[in-house]
Amino acid sequence: LLCKEIAWVDGKKANLYSLYDITDKKLYQRRIEQQAYTDFLTGLYNRMCCERDLARQIDQAKKTGGKGALLYLDLDDFKHINDGLGHQYGDVLLKSISHALKRINGIENTCYRMGGDEFVIVIPPESYSRFGNIVEDIKKIFSKPWFLKDADYYCTMSMGIVTFPDAGDSVTDLIKKADIAMYEAKKTGKNR
């Protein structure tokens, strides 16, 4: 709603009110924001959203004296799926894994695809009491076969875990530490 004072031809002052419907503009803005923070393939949140949300969770943990955790997952030998079956089946697998992760209680809105075959899960302070259960639920997802191209395929993952604010309160440092822990798990035999 806009109001502007105008002068009529006879010199008298009047107010002119203009009303604009901005519904379409707001819907467009919301769609742009969603595209900026969402991975186009899996529908999970992306790296940019992860960094923003992780900063908020770290602040919350520090304010409340709570703890949270960052889990960095990398699919083991995913290249074999892509090369052996084709990228379209790799995409199907990534979507299936994303869907399964989002169904785990306590992390429904804190799963992120960092790119390629790497995922981050943030366990916020309010879900930290379920930390052990969440890790076990993730492991269960990867203990079962995935049905691709008329056959069952196993896909394991390696996981690096750091807690916050114990391991630090810098988003960049926490992601880097979890990534390093994940590569250590890969070096010691994968599927860990």
What is each PLM-predicted segment?
Residues 33-53, 64, 73-87, 95:
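Conserved nucleotide-binding and Mg2+-coordinating catalytic segments in signaling enzymes
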Residues 65, 78, 96-97, 111, ...:
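Hydrophobic framework residues that shape the active-site pocket
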Residues 109-113, 153:
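A short pre-motif secondary-structure segment
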Residues 18, 71:
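Sensory beta-strand/linker motifs that couple input domains to effectors
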Residues 32, 50-57, 101, 119:
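Hydrophobic scaffolding residues in well-structured cytosolic catalytic/regulatory domains
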Residues 89-108:
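Active-site-proximal alpha-helical element of nucleotidyl cyclase-like catalytic domains
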Residues 2-15, 27, 170:
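Short loop/turn elements at sensory-signaling interfaces that couple input to output
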Residues 87, 132, 136, 149-151, ...:
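Catalytic-core segments of nucleotide cyclases and related cyclic-nucleotide turnover enzymes
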